[in-house]
Amino acid sequence: MNRLAVELPGLSLKNPIMPASGCFGFGREYAKFYDLSVLGAMMIKATTLEARFGNPTPRVAETPSGMLNAIGLQNPGVDYVLAEELPWLAQYDVPIIANVAGSTVEEYVEVAKRISKAPNVHALELNISCPNVKKGGIAFGTVPEVAAELTRAVKEVSDVPVYVKLSPNVTNIVAMAKAIEQAGADGLTMINTLVGMRIDVKTGKPILANGTGGLSGPAIKPIAIRMIYEVSQAVSLPIIGMGGIQSAEDVIEFFYAGASAVAIGTANFIDPYVCPNIIAELPALLDELGFDHISECTGRSWNNGQTVYCGA
């Protein structure tokens, strides 16, 4: 028995560990360190309809126990991803989760329709933290009705299951999750980064050219745990948890909160081997904790040992 295998909508994972979108590119740099086939899945960089250069520099700043980024969705566009990146990734035995971004519902729909047809794309991850240019620039992920509308539109055209990446920059993340569930999403990924800022004490100006950026890393882990704990009890969708994971113990904590798999982001910048190392360490930790299978850990903090999510 593979004690780490996880079944989710569209995803048969050999283990529940995957790199988070935006921290792993399309895997080319990390493939120099290890065989990407060891990963449970891989979330590729956000893809838009046209190529995007991203925000001006500086767009990364270190913070205590984390980092700020304002990359601005730099990517080569869906045509290039389909022609170059996904065919290159096909050499690895790893299911791909394609992160889809856009400025309008129509852009999301077009990207989703095209990228979901790629043979090694097993699921989509909707990045709903993008600003909606037709709604005054407000992020798709901050208004439940807007997020639900986007989810429904993408579900209608996608050939694969759709996971929605929840933004923590909301007053009621449970209401957001419920609206997305009712709109037909197949799963949730959470949490995205929190909006933050650093100011240079010598100049008195924000360090990031964009002013604000997304805070990630261990600093946001307690927030991610709390939000997953709340959402997992309110909806029936499987959750891929993320936010500051850097050890096997962190993975178990996310599972206890209610996650069924996890994604690792910022830690890849610190240690490129973090994903395979955690995969290797998990069986011994399960032994220590007295579990036969990783799925037994899901929702352990609130479910009295009952199965929370099992199977696709």
From Swiss-Prot:
One MF annotation (Gene Ontology) recorded for this entry = dihydroorotate dehydrogenase (NAD+) activity
* Enzyme nomenclature, EC number: 1.3.1.14
Q: Does the keyword Ligase apply?
A: no
Cofactor(s) the protein requires to work: FMN
GO CC term (a single one): cytoplasm
Where does the UniProt entry say this protein principally localizes?
Answer: cytoplasm
Q: Which residues are catalytic?
A: 130 (nucleophile)
Q: How does it assemble?
A: Heterotetramer of 2 PyrK and 2 PyrD type B subunits.
- Name the record gives this protein: Dihydroorotate dehydrogenase B (NAD(+)), catalytic subunit
Give the organism the record lists.
Anoxybacillus flavithermus (strain DSM 21510 / WK1)
Traced from the root, the source organism's taxonomic lineage reads: Bacteria, Bacillati, Bacillota, Bacilli, Bacillales
